[in-house]
């Protein structure tokens, strides 16, 4: 279907044997996202960066066989993920909503915060996604609901997956637009057209809606709170505001995440994320934060000519960053990692932040969203019920 419609998809393959999985990964190029074909919720899904990690995954995490194949997808580094929900009566097709994920593609859609409307996508990209969604709905003869997950990289639109069913985003969009997509779709399935139902997906004017995932980490303090392809969230909240920053800040508060607006920020990021520090570090300093960082990140920040205090990694001896966290000497943690060993080595940092209720983000996209949140003045926030917004 994608070939027929001339739509783009990241390179992928299906493996029924160990050796076949290795060969596919070599052909499409690492890193790849691997997952069993027979699970939901991202269970046992993993981002692997090299052949050694893939071999470990195949040996320890899953069984590969003819009846239980493994799916491998090329990982689109730094891509923006987008959910698009569509409702159709078989003739007329409408876009219910376009939700831009805050965390980059590769984080499970159930765990990523989302913005409705999109907060940084160009009009051209949004129009292209709408066109592709409508073309796919026509090709599949959809009557009812359909969800498409897109990835946007360098202004190019890629299909991640298409689900001809309701998705977890439907209730959120329905609350925002004041129109139940499930109800509209159900009536469409029994023959009532969208036109007869006078369906509209128009958002209330001048408002942004942000979904934030609610995590169960408070109940499981020894679990690593790092986000990845496997879903960990157990709920979600909605933040509403006149702009993305305020809506995002309210969503964090609703999810019981405490955003301290000044103090000390600890930054330790993977090499591929260091380029983002050129913009992020000056902005977080302007907000009112002092910076502490481990050696590699501190070297990069010093090269920018910006102030930074060095702190030891746990492996470098005490006093180290975990001591700082446990002594409540840090107010915000920015920690991105790459590779199994790096994730394991830095787990104590994220767990210590969790235990001390220190806000921790494990993506740079999430870090920039925090900057937007800090730009909103909580003293000026207003609150409205959904009934008031959608009357």
Can you say where each PLM-predicted feature lies in the sequence?
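Hydrophobic/aromatic ligand-binding patch that stacks against planar heteroaromatic rings
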Residues: 1, 24, 85, 136, ...
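ATP-dependent carboxylate activation and anion-phosphoryl transfer catalytic cores
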Residues: 1, 5-6, 28-31, 40-43, ...
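A conserved helix-loop-beta module that forms one wall/lid of the active-site cleft
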Residues: 1-45, 304-313, 365-372, 377-378
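Generic structural signal for residues in well-ordered beta-strands
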Residues: 9-12, 70-72, 148, 308, ...
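Short acidic loop-to-helix transition motifs that present clustered carboxylates
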Residues: 15-20, 53-54, 77-79, 272-274, ...
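Helix N-cap/beta->alpha junction signal
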Residues: 17, 50, 294-295, 364
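Acidic, glycine-enriched active-site microenvironments
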Residues: 145, 153-156, 166-171, 175-184, ...
